[in-house]
Amino acid sequence: MADKEVYDDAVEERVINEEYKIWKKNTPFLYDLVMTHALEWPSLTVQWLPDVNRPEGKDYVVHRLVLGTHTSDEQNHLVIASAQIPNDDAQFDASHYDSEKGAEFGGFGSVSGKIEIEIKINHEGEVNRARYMPQNPCIIATKTPTSDVLAFDYTKHPSKPDPSGDCSPDLRLRGHQKEGYGLSWNPNLSGNLLSASDDHTICLWDISGAPKEGKIVDAKTIFTGHTAVVEDVSWHLLHESLFGSVADDQKLMIWDTRSNNTSKPSHSVDAHTAEVNCLSFNPYSEFILATGSADKTVALWDLRNLKLKLHSFESHKDEIFQVQWSPHNETILASSGTDRRLNVWDLSKIGEEQSAEDAEDGPPELLFIHGGHTAKISDFSWNPNEPWVICSVSEDNIMQVWQMAENIYNDEEPDTPASELEGQAS
């Protein structure tokens, strides 16, 4: 049995390497930007910060990212990194792409592309997830391997971590019994933070009136409707009292903080045929949300009629762990997970006619497959300032900042004969 596993692993590794070579060869035709950076340790989390710095006289703009570390028994850190992204003045030409250097040296389109670590703050154990507070992006909440949720104001910490390894968060949020991943700041109520946990509960804290001395904040409310690990939680983007949660009990639940019943959601739906790992509310359409599952599908929902699943997006070959709507386009969402692929979907193409050849690559709503990762994708983030730019991080320390070629989302014909494109863009 063990021999077969070793053989299967070797075959899989060879397939992954072959696919990666094909992907790399085709990057100039499929992308307007690809930057690949090997982090010292893998990050389980990534989120673009909302600020942009535009240095005068340069052909790039500087964006910043929140990352974490997942080390092997070494000191862990909450990390702020910067990425130089070429602006419209920067000129690229696919023919200048050095295929030998390829993605290892920054890759296609990143003449000036640099990724640098700016701030490292000591953290207790790996950073399961880190998210900034929209009303004050200096404040970042993190999920740890313990039951505590931590909050850091990164302006109050030195950019180089204390060598002692002491972790001194500005606040410690208590209420869970176990670790977890889900974390969501309320975009409409400053300081209101939700967290999902393996202990089957969701905690809500309000840190706006947090103690200045004690540093410990107890949960304001604990929601107990799920009967298994709660994987993710998200506030509605327009209604300050509504949020959604998903769990290993295969359910999607919609909650209203105005309700006195913290054990019964206002809506509960059997969303998938396996664990539900993630959810995302559409930023433009107040009734629409998406969920991603271990059943390999992304489901589309309408809050006005949750009994009926609007659509199921099918193309992933393994568990889905992250789903996020584009901040710039109402019909665009992306999903990623264990199959090492990040899929970008376009709702407006659902039901379009396809040739038999196109159908082999995936359904018409599958706009693009990002094939640059050779390990499970842990998290990704749409850039809020640069349309179509995504940062994705995988378990093998790789972080990629990329933007698909404009002709793909503008429905134009590529400049390249189709015969040269090998099965990545559909």
From Swiss-Prot:
Where is this protein localized, as stated in its record? Nucleus
Q: Name one GO cellular component term.
A: ESC/E(Z) complex
Pinpoint the residue ranges of every WD repeat in the record: 47-123, 129-174, 182-218, 229-270, 276-313, 319-370, 377-404
PROSITE patterns per UniProt: WD_REPEATS_1, WD_REPEATS_2, WD_REPEATS_REGION
Q: Show the GO MF annotations.
A: histone binding
Q: Which domain of life is it from?
A: Eukaryota
InterPro entries assigned:
G-protein_beta_WD-40_rep, Histone-bd_RBBP4-like_N, WD40/YVTN_repeat-like_dom_sf, WD40_repeat_CS, WD40_repeat_dom_sf, WD40_rpt, WD_repeat_RBAP46/RBAP48/MSI1
Chief subcellular site?
Answer: nucleus
Which keywords appear in this protein's UniProt record, sorted alphabetically? Chaperone, Chromatin regulator, DNA replication, Nucleus, Repeat, Repressor, Transcription, Transcription regulation, WD repeat
**Gene Ontology BP annotations:** chromatin remodeling; DNA replication; fin regeneration; hematopoietic progenitor cell differentiation; regulation of DNA-templated transcription
* Subunit field text: Binds directly to helix 1 of the histone fold of histone H4, a region that is not accessible when H4 is in chromatin.
Instruction: Give the family, as the similarity comment puts it.
Output: Belongs to the WD repeat RBAP46/RBAP48/MSI1 family.
- What does this protein's UniProt record list under function? Core histone-binding subunit that may target chromatin remodeling factors, histone acetyltransferases and histone deacetylases to their histone substrates in a manner that is regulated by nucleosomal DNA. Component of several complexes which regulate chromatin metabolism.
Its name, as the record gives it, is Histone-binding protein RBBP7
